[in-house]
Amino acid sequence: SVGFKAGVKDYKLTYYTPDYETKDTDILAAFRVTPQPGVPPEEAGGAVAAESSTGTWTTVWTDGLTSLDRYKGRCYHIEPVAGEENQYIAYVAYPLDLFEEGSVTNMFTSIVGNVFGFKALRALRLEDLRIPPAYVKTFQGPPHGIQVERDKLNKYGRPLLGCTIKPKLGLSAKNYGRAVFECLRGGLDFTKDDENVNSQPFMRWRDRFLFCAEAIYKAQAETGEIKGHYLNATAGTCEEMMKRAVFARELGVPIVMHDYLTGGFTANTSLAHYCRDNGLLLHIHRAMHAVIDRQKNHGIHFRVLAKALRMSGGDHIHSGTVVGKLEGERDITLGFVDLLRDDFVEKDRSRGIYFTQDWVSLPGVLTVASGGIHVWHMPALTEIFGDDSVLQFGGGTLGHPWGNAPGAVANRVALEACVQARNEGRDLATEGNAIIRKACKWSTELAAACEVWKEIKFEFAAM
């Protein structure tokens, strides 16, 4: 007789376990599964659980040398997606022991590493992950977090203001530094390297760092406020990235920046550790995210990438603007904005949150609204994102007819007017335009900005 039962058997026999009670230490995943025609959802869900944990396509002799019951992923619930044909949400529980501590890289390699090319599935999307406190505690998380950042910058009770320097490619280092100085002098808190500014022939990184540091110190002296410029440390190797971060620290600047998806989670986590040890804030850009998260039925939802960033480490992350998008998008976006900032977030399917997430006092991340926004959007942005955010106006600062500094003044005046109105109990949703118009009366810079972008009409519903 044969020592073990060889052969291929259905995944659902081993990996679909609807009676399973999830443990507090399990990592839970919600997958949107689109099976191939003729594949039952239980088999598809079981296949996902198997391929992303202990399973392979056939029974193997070495299965007898370990305890599958202890280590296997389990598909414990399947529900059809309302309004979609042949789409299901498969819930999978993974034992904590399957994952290396403090490694976002390993977590993703396990959960989404292999299973997305699986033949039995037409498409697969990871919609959400529940990270148990036991695993959260193995991560350092953001270098500083929201409260420490405010204390470092001495800025309270309002969103922070930023601006991406444009044209993003082609300026010399000295002209780049000049643009930075004008923006900071006018009243912005931060300026930003574009995500694709690394170290190109027309502007090497060291020159840029030096001129930007000079701009920061001059603007601080002139305004009496703490200023920063997100110096992009992203590089072709981790060693080069660290070299840039070290140089930024030696210049005494407050913040550096990293592209966490193109740079990779391993590089990002190393940089985050360096930033915490050396008092640097870390701004995170999400370049490449849409490649992964844009398709509705395949890929990884951004809320998962956002959770991963909070674990890997970053003090700011770009998270969309909400403004002018569809209503549903707003709720979904605010769902992952809360996942980034709050300590404890309740399950809420209407906001796309599949699991209750307890971050057990891992520091929070400031969400960054950036892209196509201008002064008329300020009331909406203040209302939607609240104080713990960075509002970034690239063209909305540099496109001002009088130049960068007046563009910065216009944004700062608009923001202060909105914050004051909110604190006085006025409703930004209904009175936003009036608040901006009134502020124009005592700021010619704002009036000029409002004139340039007045065509873009903007109304939004109250929360």
Curated annotation (Swiss-Prot):
Mg(2+) binds at K192, D194, E195. One of its GO terms (molecular function) is ribulose-bisphosphate carboxylase activity. Binds 1 Mg(2+) ion per subunit. PROSITE patterns: RUBISCO_LARGE. The modification N6,N6,N6-trimethyllysine is found at K5. Keywords: Calvin cycle, Carbon dioxide fixation, Chloroplast, Disulfide bond, Lyase, Magnesium, Metal-binding, Methylation, Monooxygenase, Oxidoreductase, Photorespiration, Photosynthesis, Plastid. The active site is at K166, H285. One of its GO terms (cellular component) is chloroplast. Heterohexadecamer of 8 large chains and 8 small chains; disulfide-linked. The disulfide link is formed within the large subunit homodimers. This is Ribulose bisphosphate carboxylase large chain.
